[in-house]
From Swiss-Prot:
Predominant location: mitochondrion
UniProt protein name: Cytochrome b
Record key words, sorted: Electron transport, Heme, Iron, Membrane, Metal-binding, Mitochondrion, Mitochondrion inner membrane, Respiratory chain, Transmembrane, Transmembrane helix, Transport, Ubiquinone
Transmembrane segments: 33-53, 77-98, 113-133, 178-198, 226-246, 288-308, 320-340, 347-367
Residues reported in the UniProt entry to bind a ubiquinone: 201
PANTHER family: CYTOCHROME B
Source species: Artibeus concolor (Brown fruit-eating bat)
Gene for this chain: MT-CYB
Length: 379
């Protein structure tokens, strides 16, 4: 008798995706982050759903409703901090996942890669709108500053900003719509994740060597299911440790002050996971130029496959490219640090140098070094 998991219309989809899926035998821990992102998304949707049951999206009561969740709702503090720090874990896994793709040449699967970029934008938009909801000082001023950037768009900019705000400033209408979109977007993200996986399973996974692994495949279950479960346990332990021991470590103290349109905080900055892009934005003195650089800092990932000049897919066996890759990582850490600093000397020039280096490495140095490596292969 044929196994039900191979014949049932629903079970056979799950079976071909998570049980009998042929996977390369050489996948390292870097391939764990896709499944970890799935767990993060699940945690965020569940905690967010329960938080939404107690939250009110009104400027008069939003801040107090979050306080009420933490003080009066059973385990409300746990839900709130799991959700806030879960977002941080989400972005850690997201950046490591993208970094893995860059290092091992996974971007050569262009459909999967492009859906991934869409996912990155969607998750960033979701996180930004979520940060506005507690209606603290940094929520209000972050929303004001970031949405106001759209006014740099010629002709339609000002109208666009007022349309997003629902008025002439960030107010009740803005908060209500941000809550609606913050609730909706994770489900759109979930749908995009399914499309992402659909395209991935069309080609099969890449592997650390970058060499086709068709002759050497193993079933996903039990090998990679066990490996993924270990990853879940490590990540959830890290998240629980963060939530239970220092839940406010990655947050901003200013967000415990209720939003006040008449008092500007000394340093307006987004959450840590946006600081690298914020530093690039601030490093350009022109408003429109800054906005374009901000968008390009993420959108540049879309042209990485076009800039691939190496004869080898992965950086595993390339002598020079990994040095540039780790320099890029160092530049991103520098930008993250600069994004959290005030706009003054020497931070301005460090930010500008790091921003130029970021684009230079991806657009020019990586393709050039790859061509040098191709030449070295002939020796």
């Amino acid at each position: 008798m044929t196994n039900i998991r191979k014949t049932h219309p629903l079970l056979k989809i799950i079976n071909s995706s998570f049980v009998d899926l042929p996977a390369p035998s050489s996948l390292s821990t870097w391939w764990n982050f896709g499944s970890l992102l799935g767990v993060c998304l699940g945690v965020q949707i569940l905690t967010g759903l329960f938080l939404a049951m107690h939250y009110t999206s009104d400027t008069a009561t939003a801040f107090n409703s979050v306080t009420h969740i933490c003080r009066d709702v059973n385990y409300g503090w746990l839900l709130r901090y799991l959700h806030a720090n879960g977002a941080s874990m989400f972005f850690i896994c997201l950046y490591l996942h993208v970094g893995r793709g860059l290092y091992y040449g996974s971007y050569m699967y262009s459909e999967t890669w492009n859906i991934g970029i869409l996912l990155l934008f969607a998750v960033m938009a979701t996180a930004f709108m979520g940060y506005v909801l507690p209606w603290g000082q940094m929520s209000f001023w972050g929303a004001t500053v970031i949405t106001n950037l759209l006014s740099a768009i010629p002709y339609i900019g000002t109208d666009l900003v007022q349309w997003i705000w629902g008025g002439f400033s960030v107010d009740k209408a803005t908060l209500t719509r941000f809550f609606a979109f913050h609730f909706l977007l994770p489900f759109i993200v979930t749908a995009l994740v399914m499309v992402h996986l659909l395209f991935l399973h069309e080609t099969g996974s890449n592997n650390p060597t970058g060499i086709p692994s068709d002759p050497d495949m193993i079933p996903f279950h039990p090998y990679y299911t066990i490996k993924d479960i270990l990853g879940f346990l490590i990540m959830l332990t890290a998240l629980a440790t963060l939530v239970l021991f220092s839940p406010d470590l990655l947050g901003d103290p200013d967000n415990y002050i209720p939003a006040n349109p008449s008092i500007t905080p000394p340093h307006i900055k987004p959450e840590w996971y946006f600081l690298f892009a914020y530093a690039i934005l601030r490093s350009i003195p022109n408003k429109l130029g800054g906005v374009l650089a901000l968008v390009m800092s993420i959108l540049i990932l879309a042209i990485v496959p076009i800039l691939h000049t190496s004869k080898q897919r992965s950086m595993m066996f390339r002598p020079l490219s990994p040095c540039l890759f780790w320099l890029l990582v160092a530049v991103l850490f520098t930008l993250t640090w600069i994004g959290g600093q005030p706009v003054e000397h020497p931070y301005i020039i460090i930010g500008q140098t790091a921003s130029v280096l970021y684009f230079l490495i991806i657009l020019l140095l990586m393709p050039m070094i790859s061509m040098v490596e191709n030449y070295l292969l002939k020796w």
